[in-house]
């Protein structure tokens, strides 16, 4: 993981957190609600600026950010009955402020996708596999396969998109040493049917001597309407995949807990993208922005969704729950959230390749 690639990924993550907090901040200020603090990160401030009413800061622990209101400050000079305190506003006004961070992340993700599809384009996965290379004198070459062919089906089984297509292709070939298999390929505008007999390797498994790549189609908008349409399709697909992923995590947490990624893992993933193809940082940013929105809307303490639950209860009961109870729940949730963040940072840091290589020599163990 190169330093520049890591910095690019960190920059993307920082921008997305800033967008989320700016959503809360803008929703409050546009309604005339007092805001005392706008912070990126938690813990002691690294940089700080005091505005006319609001303190702006970048803090040491990069696990999120927050917008603070004088309602939470017992030393605030603003009268408790000030109509522009958040707590004195109607439920709808407060709900707008609380949900604005999620909305900001979703809107920003959509505009990132518009930016990508308008300038670079999307690479959409299509069914089948591309053959970029055919080994000399291999079973595939003998059968007439050529570089650039797109494999559509094997043994009458239509290939899905990547990565399932790769798994299916390799499985069929390996299980068929010295057994002819029928392969349908697309070559230019033509469709051809080839019969390939995999040769056994040293382990007795079949091989045909080709390299495999995903079959991708680059979509680039030629006008504003196409940009909006393509971006909407990509946005819908990412939201659907994200919500499905969270549902699988929640419904089968024991098996999927190891897949939960913290900031370090996200930065590593983003750095790999930046190193291989920086243009994909648009889509990476949109993906993480949508993930931030989905995470924050979950009805859990210390998250925006948890605060919306309190508002819902207030609307049903006609009065808010006791303030001490709400504060206790939120503080407990914040401690648990920070603890989870620290755990994920430590775990993901220890799993980084260069750390894994460093630890044996540092500890003296092999």
From Swiss-Prot:
SUPFAM superfamilies assigned to the protein according to its UniProt record, in alphabetical order: PDZ domain-like (SSF50156)
Cofactor(s) needed for function: Zn(2+)
Name of the protein in its database record: Putative zinc metalloprotease slr1821
PDZ domain sequence ranges: 106-188
Keywords: Cell inner membrane, Cell membrane, Hydrolase, Membrane, Metal-binding, Metalloprotease, Protease, Transmembrane, Transmembrane helix, Zinc
Keyword Protease: yes
Organismal lineage: Bacteria, Bacillati, Cyanobacteriota, Cyanophyceae, Synechococcales
Membrane topology: Multi-pass membrane protein
Family under the similarity heading: Belongs to the peptidase M50B family.
GO molecular function terms noted in the UniProt entry: metal ion binding; metalloendopeptidase activity
SMART domains for this protein: PDZ (SM00228)
GO cellular component: plasma membrane
Gene3D superfamilies per UniProt: 2.30.42.10
Subcellular location: Cell inner membrane
Active-site residues per Swiss-Prot or TrEMBL entry: 21
Entry annotated with the keyword Heme: no
Organism of origin: Synechocystis sp. (strain ATCC 27184 / PCC 6803 / Kazusa)
């Amino acid at each position: 993981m190169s330093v520049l690639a890591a910095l690019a990924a960190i920059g993307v993550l920082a921008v997305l957190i800033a967008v989320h907090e700016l959503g809360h901040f803008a929703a409050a200020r546009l309604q005339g609600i007092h805001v005392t603090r706008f912070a990126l990160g938690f813990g002691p401030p690294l940089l700080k600026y005091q505005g006319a009413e609001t303190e702006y800061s970048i803090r040491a622990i990069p696990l999120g950010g927050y917008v603070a209101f004088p309602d939470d400050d017992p030393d605030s000079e603003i009268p408790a009955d000030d109509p522009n305190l958040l707590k004195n506003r109607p439920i709808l006004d407060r709900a707008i402020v609380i949900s604005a961070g999620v909305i900001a992340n979703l809107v920003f993700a959509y505009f990132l996708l518009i930016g990508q599809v308008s300038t670079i384009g999307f690479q959409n996965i299509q069914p089948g596999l591309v053959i970029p290379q055919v080994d000399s004198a291999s079973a595939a070459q003998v059968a007439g396969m050529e570089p650039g062919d797109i494999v559509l089906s094997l043994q009458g089984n239509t290939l899905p998109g990547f990565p399932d297509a790769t798994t299916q292709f390799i499985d069929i070939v390996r299980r068929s040493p010295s057994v002819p298999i029928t392969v349908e390929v697309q070559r230019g505008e033509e469709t051809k049917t080839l019969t390939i007999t995999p040769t056994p390797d040293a382990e007795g498994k079949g091989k045909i001597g080709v390299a495999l790549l995903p079959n991708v189609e680059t979509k680039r908008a030629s006008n504003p309407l196409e940009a909006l349409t393509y971006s909407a399709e990509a946005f819908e697909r990412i939201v659907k995949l994200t919500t499905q992923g969270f549902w699988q995590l929640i419904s089968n947490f024991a098996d999927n807990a190891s897949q939960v990624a913290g900031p370090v893992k996200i930065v590593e993933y983003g750095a790999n993208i930046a190193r291989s193809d920086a243009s994909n940082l648009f889509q990476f940013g949109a993906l993480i922005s949508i993930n931030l929105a989905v995470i924050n809307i979950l009805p859990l303490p210390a998250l925006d969704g948890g605060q919306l639950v309190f508002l819902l209860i207030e609307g049903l009961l006609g009065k808010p729950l006791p303030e001490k109870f709400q504060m206790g729940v939120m503080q407990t949730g914040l401690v648990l959230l920070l603890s989870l963040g620290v755990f994920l940072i430590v775990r993901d840091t220890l799993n980084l390749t260069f750390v894994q290589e460093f630890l044996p020599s540092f500890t003296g163990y092999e």
